[in-house]
Amino acid sequence: MRDLLNLFKQPGAQLEDFDAIRIGLASPEMIRSWSYGEVKKPETINYRTFKPERDGLFCAKIFGPVKDYECLCGKYKRLKHRGVVCEKCGVEVTVAKVRRERMGHIDLASPVAHIWFLKSLPSRIGLLLDMTLRDVERVLYFEAYIVIEPGMTPLEQGQLLTDEQYLEAVEEHGDEFDARMGAEAVLEILKGMDLEAEARRLRDDIEATGSESKIKRLSKRLKLLEAFLESGNKPEWLIMTVLPVLPPDLRPLVPLDGGRFATSDLNDLYRRVINRNNRLKRLLELAAPDIIVRNEKRMLQESVDALLDNGRRGRAITGTNKRPLKSLADMIKGKQGRFRQNLLGKRVDYSGRSVIVVGPTLRLHQCGLPKRMALELFKPFIFSKLQRRGLATTIKAAKKMVERETGEVWDILDEVIREHPVLLNRAPTLHRLGIQAFEPVLIEGKAIQLHPLVCTAYNADFDGDQMAVHVPLSLEAQLESRAMMMSTNNILSPASGEPIIVPSQDVVLGIYYMTRERVNARGEGMRLAGVEEVHRAYQTGAAELGARVEVRIRERVFDDSGEMVERVQRRQTTIGRALLFDIVPDGLPFEAVDRELDKKGVSGLVNACYRRVGLKGTVVFADQLMYTGFFYSTKAGVSIGVDDMEVPTDKEEALRSAEEEVREIEDQYASGLVTSGERYNKVVDIWAHTNDQVAGAMMEKMGKETVVDAEGNETEQKSLNSIFIMADSGARGSAAQIRQLAGMRGLMAKPDGSIIETPITANFREGLNVLQYFISTHGARKGLADTALKTANSGYLTRRLVDVSQDLVVTEEDCGTTDGLVQTPIIEGGDVVETLAERVLGRVVAEDVAVPGSTDIAVEAGTLLDEDWVERLERMGVDEIKVRSAVTCETRHGVCAKCYGRDLARGHGVNIGEAVGVIAAQSIGEPGTQLTMRTFHIGGAASRAAAVSQVEVRNTGKARLHNIKTVQHHSGSYVAVSRSGELTVMDEYGRERERYKIPYGAVLSVGDEDPVEAGQVVANWDPHTHPIVTEVDGYVRFHDFVEGVTVQREVDEVTGLSSLVVTDPKSRGTGEHKRQVTNANGKVTEERVAYKDLRPMIKLVDGDGNDLNIAGTQIPAHYYLPAGAIVSLEDNAEVRVGDALARIPQEASKTRDITGGLPRVADLFEARKPKEPAILAEASGTVGFGKETKGKQRLIITKADGETHEELIPKWRNVTVFEGEHVEKGETIADGEPNPHDILRLLGVTKLAEYIVQEIQDVFRLQGVGINDKHIEVIVRQMLRKTIVSDPGDSLHLKGEQVDRAKLLEENEQLQAQDKQPAQWEPSLLGITKASLSTESFISAASFQETTRVLTEAATRGIRDDLRGLKENVIVGRLIPAGTGFAYHAARRQEAPAPAATPEQQAEEVFASLGQGEGEGPSPSDEASGPEVE
């Protein structure tokens, strides 16, 4: 009974169940109500007796006893005196644990501003007072007076006065007015503020003013005032008059041996505050001179600043060893802070770690656990079993037995472990497959055995990797481990839906070796009655694995109706394939293995098995496949010898001809036909091409061998060269690596990524000379340095992604939207990169799909497309489908199952409660790390593709030109003069087969709708320069060409040929150029132009010198030249349509690996504006050009209704539209990388989603990483959570305010229900960091980044956190509202009992201690009526 009573007395026990957490400002009364007494002295403990000093920082009277149930002087000991307060030492007799929760306080002799609300930008105190931070600081740190009450004087409230001004005012007005300095002055002003009147005034001001910047400034202040009004915070609480003292056990003082003490930095900081506070009290009692008191007050302010946030203002206070002391703010922020170190990641009991070794004999669901480790991990289970068996009477006896390791202990360990899964984890855990459950198998030794097939998921290898083992203790945990985390349940990768339990290396090699066919092998032509005979023939040596034989095969497959039927047929196959078919499960046809299986094939086999046979069969099959693969790769006896690296005979020839070509280009350069940049590009191209040629010849030679068949004729077959079969099977190595061994090492990159133009012509077999070796190490070092940096970058990207998407969970079945994204196949050049089937697999159709060419419906809306469906659609020739997407889902919180589609890791529709946000973040983040760790595998060899310079059609069909504008050259061909043009090739059904971008200046040999043949070259261009093409005949006139200033004449020393190169305006120096200007009356005047404002341009004039216009328009034919353009024409030269006036050299391409890729992905997700963004048309209409300003041209778009839209574009931007051309809203006007914010504004959400998905997929595709589009869409959805209010209507928002989408929609529904005007809004795109920081949950945001800023803002606004996301729930120590926790939270919400009826006085105590005022009672929360925690 006593225990029961005691529960009420313990302050931490009342609140287990709460629904929300609110953060706010603490009033002085509230701080006093938390406190158990005032700390008056800076002493800590007595150094002789080790007892805490009375009234000191560790005082037992205030904070509670040091030992359980024992007062300090020792008068009361034992449990029976519980609750007694000792009259001698004043200590309450209770548990010592209260020293972790009892707080004290310090009464400050002078008020002090809280540094967070002063210095955390924007300064809240400054904003409330409408003063600049600098001014507020001058008042607080006693450099200026502030007028509090002007009285009848001409001074204004809030005016600052220096010492001199103050003395003058006192002389003039006496004590008519009140002006003071320091925090008390600010406190007085804040106390006297009438927030409501101020807010009304601001609203009127906002309506009255028209200036954008003023509105922005006023609404910032208005928002803060309203936050104060709503939250019940009072402005004067920003200034502290009482300082709370942290419980002593949270800032411990630990005696070290040798009589010294280790202490928390906080004690030093508190001591400082107390010392200064006491000194100030004394000075005030003594009525010391003003200047001394002022100085002391300032020092008090500084010491409190240091305690709260050391180093935020001025120099940080340092301890003895020159290291800044850790203040309260440092305790919670950063990687080592409370949030990330202790709340989000904890150390786990019942765990161990050890090195891993390979366990090739294990089954897929097993792992080998060392006996000693298991004994230690399962101790409590063993103890209880020993006791239950009566083998040990007490726990102590059981412990002894276990330590002696008697025989019974091992038997019991076997029992305990049976069917008790353990979790294995390998750091870094980049995705959810980094922790999986296995059944332990006890083994001797000290290393953990791991099944080879799960290595891919863990990214583990056996070169010394370590793994951790964890034991799930509770029944629920064991159940979850078995049902969801077992390795056998994780066969498919959540990122792409492909199998991840896929054989690699030896296994692939063995299976490839089995399924290879050999000409004239022993036993060729045998006829065998069944697989048993095949076994016999192979084992007796009558036949070899690759021999072609005829076998009677008995297969069991599913027929069309889905029934299992048996078929027996005679098949021509090889011994190896028949043997392999023996382990294939029922339901897979013999065709599945009747081919040469490389890594892709084996992966496809596992996938097909999963789809046809299901999970269980696949698991068994995967194991069998592994055992078989290991067996036959051992049998194959593959080994590498130096002779296997066959250097092709025609390598010498290829090198010689390449050197010839290079010499020729050097000659051209010498004769001035090409520039230095072009020469470099061409040389690099030649070598890249040669390298491919040599590699091709080498693979040709290695991959074929000549053999004699049974008839005695010579035939060629695939070779059995060891290196070749390793690469060909996909077991290890790649063509690129073999090329370096036996071909030529090729071009290498410098550390800055540029390619060294002299390649390494030797290979590793021939060996490198010193120079070649140096060049090769040069690039390789960069690879290693990159790896270290990229790993960190990638980890940070993953962290940001998880943070932005962590609260996205599937919360309902169907949101009922018909919106979605239109999917089409992705075609790059002549290749279909991703078919429509691959893109829509596992998605839900948004609108009925019609059969092409008819009105019949092929698929109804709402169908989840599985493999069978997409195959059917492929056969029908459907080329676009609108599917549901997370981006367009209308669920308020979370996303619905229909919009998400298939759960990729399970292969069926997604379950409610699945944490799709985190899965998406992991799927995108994990390959980032993988790829970055993989940059150096090719050893810095520059993998640069030879530049494309022509379009060669692959399929016969019809050419179609899309937005290409051409002019006819006098030679008869067409020249493209538009930029975003594309040429597509259609097959006879009108389906698009190929798509090519046609650059400006390309020469086309076909027109629109012309027939083309496969292999025909339809367009070609110079890849290294960008021409400026004339569209009229005429004569060239140079304008603003000033040699030595705007253009440099470059004369080639060898040839004497000269060309003009336009200089960069930034590097022109200062000076002025005089130029003649003819005005309208024909009068010639002279004007002076600064060098940097000169704009070199080529005008075209007719024979009489009049300006020519571009055909069919009123635009003069003026061509501005950008910096770097090369002009080879002379003034007054004659040009014809389609001629090039100038060439702009293109940059040499740097090697693109994901290093270019990772920052690119980060830029896209952060929604950063590109350096030179493309300029998009703001409206649809006809283009015109208006009056130009000095550096800009004015582009005018006239809409169909006659409205015009103007835009100023810098003249140096290459405008791609011409006068009179029609543009659509959102079309590109000036080249560049599109700005995602523009795409969203002009083209809408779906186009934005398509753009981001496309760009990110391009980066990953380049690296051969498959990620499903839906993961990227999920992140995009999270980036679009916020909206900008464009018209507030009758809502309380301000124009331009950023509001959460779900919140705004809910408010609008309420407004419409009351027949009021809802707020109008536009979607807003936030980068992932910004989006994470602006989430509804302050706990989640604070634990992510910028903790101080987030908490400061949350506290002033008095925000409640409804604990919706996963992160908040982990931090407060609950199950997450996803997965199995989803049901728990739903049940909690329904039960939510009314607060227990305790006697009135106790309830009051509870709420008083919570600081909600006397018995206000709980404020009702959204979903339930549990009290809030403050």
Swiss-Prot record:
Recorded catalytic activity of this chain's protein: RNA(n) + a ribonucleoside 5'-triphosphate = RNA(n+1) + diphosphate
Gene Ontology BP annotations: DNA-templated transcription
Top-rank taxon: Bacteria
EC number: 2.7.7.6
Swiss-Prot/TrEMBL cofactor(s): Mg(2+); Zn(2+)
Residue numbers spanned by region Disordered: 1388-1430
SUPFAM superfamilies: beta and beta-prime subunits of DNA dependent RNA-polymerase (SSF64484)
Gene Ontology MF term list: DNA binding; DNA-directed RNA polymerase activity; magnesium ion binding; zinc ion binding
Biased composition (Low complexity): 1392-1405
Binding site for Mg(2+): 461, 463, 465
Gene Ontology, cellular component aspect: DNA-directed RNA polymerase complex
Binding site for Zn(2+) 2: 815, 889, 896, 899
Top-level enzyme category: transferase
Cofactor binding remark: Binds 1 Mg(2+) ion per subunit.
Positions bound to Zn(2+) 1: 71, 73, 86, 89
The entry's keywords: DNA-directed RNA polymerase, Magnesium, Metal-binding, Nucleotidyltransferase, Transcription, Transferase, Zinc
HAMAP family, per the entry: RNApol_bact_RpoC (MF_01322)
Family, as annotated: Belongs to the RNA polymerase beta' chain family.
Function, in words: DNA-dependent RNA polymerase catalyzes the transcription of DNA into RNA using the four ribonucleoside triphosphates as substrates.
Quaternary data: The RNAP catalytic core consists of 2 alpha, 1 beta, 1 beta' and 1 omega subunit. When a sigma factor is associated with the core the holoenzyme is formed, which can initiate transcription.
Name used for this protein in its record: DNA-directed RNA polymerase subunit beta'
Annotated organism of origin: Halorhodospira halophila (strain DSM 244 / SL1)
